[in-house]
Swiss-Prot record:
Residues 28-37 have a biased composition (Basic residues). GO terms for cellular component: cytoplasm; nucleoplasm; nucleus. The keyword Nucleotide-binding does not apply. Residues 98-109 have a biased composition (Polar residues). Transcription regulator. Forms a sequence-specific DNA-binding protein complex with MAD1, MAD4, MNT, WBSCR14 and MLXIP which recognizes the core sequence 5'-CACGTG-3'. The TCFL4-MAD1, TCFL4-MAD4, TCFL4-WBSCR14 complexes are transcriptional repressors. Plays a role in transcriptional activation of glycolytic target genes. Involved in glucose-responsive gene regulation. Efficient DNA binding requires dimerization with another bHLH protein. Binds DNA as a heterodimer with MAD1, MAD4, MNT, WBSCR14 and MLXIP. Can also bind DNA as a homodimer. It comes from the Eukaryota. It comes from Mus musculus. Expressed in all tissues examined: stomach, duodenum, jejunum, ileum, colon, liver, pancreas, salivary gland, kidney, spleen, lung, heart, skeletal muscle, brain, ovary and testis. GO terms for biological process: nucleocytoplasmic transport; positive regulation of glycolytic process; positive regulation of lipid biosynthetic process; positive regulation of transcription from RNA polymerase II promoter by glucose. This is Max-like protein X. Residues 1-63, 98-119 are annotated as: Disordered.
């Protein structure tokens, strides 16, 4: 503390002012270095009157702090209270600016970081969900294929039969498919064969229906005229026709049969039946006998 009547020329006053000026200059330069890379940090230029001490304040009296310093040195008198207050306020302001700039630069932007973290977590969770969904779909596909091969082995009979070349080993997928293809081809052939048989049977049914209709008409005609034709052919004529047919057949039978053994007789009988009892041969024999009887009667 200085006395109210102390002169600015006092060495103690000069030393105190020089120390304050030096401290203020060091603090300003430190703040300038710390705030050089920060946006909005307060900086003091070398021409600032606060860095130049009392001389700077005398040259630039427009600064508020310089007004108090100039008043303290006016009229060759020094007001220690005003000087200490000015120095204290300057140091407090510089310290507050330094703390504010440091805190402003050190406090992180929590909203942006939270949003970035949430986006990264959402991306990771989305990738995990897609990976799990893909894994589940792939597992379902493999299970469906496995069930299909198991069903084929159960349905196809050739897959159930044991192949001795393979042994007791499990059938591979290629073998199951090949056996299935072979079985399907076999089913197609059987289907075609059965369709042909069905077509033949349908034709036979149609022919039988026509014959049935014809026989029904013959029966109906005979029922309408039951006595028609009874007196036209006598029993003697019928016997003569039968006798003529049998004589012709016996002639060929007697010429073809050998009775040396039972085996030869059996062979000759079957050979004679196949040769002389055909429909066309019998037809010719009957026509010839009828012509002979006609000539005899008329």
């Amino acid at each position: 503390m200085t006395e109210p009547g102390a002169s600015p020329e006092d060495p103690w006053v000069k030393a105190s002012f020089a120390d304050a000026h030096a401290g203020e200059g060091r603090a300003g330069r430190a703040r300038a270095r710390r705030g050089s890379g920060r946006r909005g940090a307060p900086q003091l230029s070398p021409e600032s009157p606060l860095l130049s001490g009392a001389r700077g304040c005398r040259e630039d009296s427009s600064h508020p702090a310089c007004a108090k310093v100039e008043y303290a040195y006016s009229d060759n008198s020094l007001d220690p209270g005003l000087f200490v207050e000015s120095t204290h306020k300057g140091s407090v302001v510089s310290r507050a600016n330094s703390i504010g700039s440091t805190s402003a630069s050190s406090v992180p932007n929590t909203d942006d970081e939270d949003s970035d973290y949430q986006q990264e977590a959402y991306k990771e969770s989305y990738k995990d969900r897609r990976r799990r969904a893909h894994t589940q779909a792939e597992q379902k596909r493999r299970d469906a294929i496995k069930r299909g091969y198991d069903d084929l082995q159960t349905i196809v009979p050739t897959c159930q039969q044991q192949d001795f070349s393979i042994g007791s080993q499990k059938l591979s997928k290629a073998i199951v498919l090949q056996k299935t293809i072979d079985y399907i081809q076999f089913l197609h052939k059987e289907k075609k064969k059965q369709e042909e048989e069905v077509s033949t049977l349908r034709k036979d049914v149609t022919a039988l229906k026509i014959m049935k209709v014809n026989y029904e008409q013959i029966v109906k005609a005979h029922q309408d005229n039951p006595h028609e034709g009874e007196d036209q052919v006598s029993d003697q004529v019928k016997f003569n026709v039968f006798q003529g047919i049998m004589d012709s057949l016996f002639q060929s039978f007697n010429a073809s049969i050998s009775v040396a053994s039972f085996q030869e007789l059996s062979a000759c009988v079957f050979s004679w039946i196949e040769e002389h009892c055909e429909p066309q041969t019998l037809r010719e024999i009957v026509i010839g006998v009828l012509h002979q009887l006609k000539n005899q009667l008329y």
